[in-house]
C-alpha cells in the first residue's frame, strides 16, 4: 500500500538561518533579539505597581522602530516541587515547610521576550505570496547597516527602560542560551520537546488537518480573535476574589484567566506588530469613507463609521499609535 503522508526533515523546515552576535537571523532575513524576563512574585503586586509596569512597557515599546514585532511568551509547565532537603543550616520551620510542600504539583512559569526587526513586505505578506514576485531575495533593510544599527540601539534603549523599573528584569540571552551547550539544552530545544529538561530527546512532530502532535504531547491552539470572546473593557489588573477580603485586595493581571489560572500545560503568546501608524490611520480614514457611502444600505455600516471616526478623533488628538495585536494559547496534553 502506498504511503501518501508527507514526511520531511526538521532541517528543511527550520526557520532560522544562523545566530550572529547573539541575534537570531531567520531565512527571511528577520533579526530577533531574545530576552529572559523576571517578573514579581505572584500575589505581591499592587494595583499601582501594575499601572507602573504597564506604563514602562508602553514607554519601551514606543522607542522601537516601525515594522518591529514584539513577542512575549509565557510558559506554564506542570512540575512537582523538589526542595533541597540536604541543605545544612536550615531552621526547624524551613525543614517543616520543605516536607510539607515536597512533591506537591505546581505550574512552573517562565517568560521570554523576542524583539524582531522585519520589513513592510514581510509584515503584510499573505499566504499567496511568492518570492518570484520581487526582483531580489533579501529585503533592502537587512543590507542597510544603518537600519540594523538603529534597531540594535532601540533594543538597548528598550532594555534600559524596562530594567529601570523595580518590578521587571530583562536578561539578554546569549548564543549558548539559545542553542544550548554540551551540558545543557537551550531555548530552541524546548520547542522540539515542550519540556524543561536540560537535554530532552528529539521528538517527532506531526502536523495534520485534525491534530498537531510533538512526541506524546497533543497540542490544541486557541486564538483570541473574535470580538465576542473579548471583554467590553480592559484594565491592567483585576481583583482575585478567592484571596481578597473586605479590607484587602489581591490583584492579578488582566490576562490571568488565560495564563496562570489555566490549570494545564500551556504557552500563552502575545504579539504586537508595530507598523507605520500614519499609514494605518489613512487606511482607517478610507474605511470610514467607505462605511459612510454604504450607510444608506445598512445601519451596521453607519454604526461602524461612527466607531471608526471616534477612534480616529482620539488617535489624532492624543497621539495614539495604531498597531496590530494577536494573542493565542497553545495547550499541550
State each model region's role.
Residues 1-331:
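Extended, folded cores of ATP/NTP-driven motor/assembly subunits in large transport
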